[in-house]
């Protein structure tokens, strides 16, 4: 019995001595590093083409959309849009953007969302989730190649801080759709 206890003590001592004596890395406050336990490496980080959970976790942490999901449910909360107005018929949404910037310091504008949605709906891109925007006027027709002029799609930057979205029919769930990472610029 004494031999077993001694052997166990010896084994634990050897395992304890295997640790590195490397001090923790000191980071300055201005260092911006995202550490994320992701399970696997992402295949891509294009919000309009990825479909995997590892990629979506990173995109949700890096890019904010017009709205975000409440952490305890699906209710939409303001994201880049500090507020929005919905017309009486439920078919027009006006998003008022807050001050936000890209990682390089450029200002996030309503035009960034127009560009992103145009790109997401382009048939040649092969986005897996273009139907997230099919409630937008003419979005489905553009994505399926029935129309080629994106200006006919119901999304328009009224100015740098105001985005207008026109729907083909009222869609009470539309804000929840906008929380999905594929609708982000």
Summary of predicted features, one role per range:
Residues 2-8:
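Sec-dependent signal peptide recognition
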Residues 14-17:
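C-terminal motif of bacterial Sec signal peptides marking the signal peptidase cleavage site
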Residues 19-21:
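Bacterial signal peptide processing site
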Residues 25-35:
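Immediate post-signal peptide segment of exported/extracytoplasmic ligand-binding proteins
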Residues 37-88:
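N-terminal lobe/hinge region of extracytoplasmic solute-binding protein
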Residues 83-132, 164:
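Aromatic- and charge-enriched surface segment that lines or borders ligand/interaction sites
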Residues 112-114, 121, 125-185:
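Surface-exposed binding/hinge segments that line
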